[in-house]
């Protein structure tokens, strides 16, 4: 399985909180940091509430980065999520096998890694950030590793291709609907993120528009325009996140179009997925993993299975046919409801 993207403080694609390092003063500091791969220098602000507290990288406004034209992904050296993207997949697996052997080999034999048939475009949840350029152009993309500087992404080799197309359309609609993009430094603007969740087996797609305010002008017209361009979309939800946080999804949802959730099938079981619910981002490999775990558990339909931190209960429900009883333990009420 390919490495997931790390988005500089955003959960990964819940894929990974990078920070600007420890800070020792209560006041906010500004640091200059040089990146050899860019040939430029970026200003990164980090906030602190006390000693030895990890500061959250704030928005970096420099666009001085260099693409790598010799790479399959021209920004892989900057986003930090796909360090192995230019390796043949068999070599990727060999490198990961070597790493796992080094970690666990002293404790016993290590089985061979089970690879994917198609290790590309597997990710069923995609999160995009946006920025308005001085020219007025809206770019969408991911955060450069360790910063909140947005790197434009046209095609990501781990993300669902339909999700990528929807994100491109939404960036165009931001401009045509004259919506303001949220600025982390000033706390102004409306659009924080766009998150796409895809049911790989059902084909259902949920679009989550994360806003900094519940007031969202023309949201129904915007949703209609998005669905017209992409009729495969089954629901559009406004998620409201008014906090000064690096977390993408807030606590409040307002359904704009459709049911407000999607469904997918995993291990032969049907699951409901809401905006705040955790669901494995690589469902193909998840089925392989769960199948192995259930096989090794060797259940005889006499046991009680406790699915701790269960989310929407995928592991416990997948094992339910072989257990006498399944108990799921979860704090997230939305996940329990699903």
Regions found by a protein language model. Name each.
Residues 156, 192, 197:
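RNA-binding accessory domains that recognize and position tRNA/RNA substrates
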Residues 66-71, 78-181, 201, 216:
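Extended interfacial segments that mediate partner engagement and assembly in macromolecular machines
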